[in-house]
């Protein structure tokens, strides 16, 4: 009689760990890549510690805590590692491309290190929130509340507490460049997700063939 309950609890744990792991792996991946790029190519790391705290809190720490408590008894499908990487890698790659975009833009437009950091925070926050959106879909009331609250919190911190997070006011051109980058991120990430889904499909077809 207790077996269905045990199965449901097992599914809840695995499904919720998959969601939380995807969020954590985004930061781990892009931090590792950026550290290597900074070591060999870039003069400075693009973020201040307090800025990473803002991004991590709004897109990883707080949402993963509440997502882990959610009742989720859906059947576990696919490979755990591939499922996690399929959600995390597109976001991490978008963050890295965003940082490179800012650094390349700085070669053509005058930017202070503080302005570059502010641009990187906005672009990284956008990428991370889109990953959170992907992790939360399909939406339930709780997931919608989590995503909406974290987005509102991130925007509120940017608008009302810029000094605490070492964010400077951007010039008109810097604002335009940042806006263009933010507008492009959903399309770039969608491309990476589609590429990842094709990889998953090929893996399934190979398994069926065997």
Q: Where do the model's predicted regions map?
A:
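Membrane-embedded transport module
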Residues: 1-143, 152-162
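Conserved N-terminal alpha-helical segment that immediately precedes and caps sugar-phosphate-binding
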Residues: 44-45, 168, 190
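Transmembrane alpha-helices
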Residues: 93, 150-155, 177-184
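Mid-to-C-terminal catalytic subdomains of enzymes
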Residues: 147
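Membrane-helix boundary connector in multi-pass membrane proteins
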Residues: 161-173
